[in-house]
Amino acid sequence: MGRWALPYPRRHINEVWKSVRTMYKHDELPNCKYIMCSTGKDNKEKNSVILFYFDSSKQEDKIKEYGNMLIDKLKYKPPSGVHGIYYKSKTVGADKKYLYKIDLNVDDSESD
C-alpha cells in the first residue's frame, strides 16, 4: 500500500478536506482505501497535505491512473512552487524518496 500526497495552501485545507471527505463517503474516489489530512496545527510549512491511500504499488500504470483521477476529480491546482505529486510507499528504498511522480503543467503565476 502507498499514498498520493497532494499539497494545498493551508488557507484552503478545511474547504478541500470537507469536499474530499464527501467524495470518499459517496465512493467517488475509486480504489482509494482511506484518506488522511494534515492538521491545522501551526508548523513551518506554508502548505498542508491530503493523503490518498491505494493498493497495488507495484503496478505503475494503475497507480498513475489513480493519481490522474485525483487531479481530475479534485480539479487540483497546486500551491505555488509545487510542480508534481508523489506516490510514496514503504517499499521505497533508502536511495529514493518516492516511488512514482506525476508532473503537473503549472504556471506559478496562476497557482494558489
Question: Can you name each region flagged by the protein language model?
Answer:
Residues 1-112:
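Extended amphipathic alpha-helical regions
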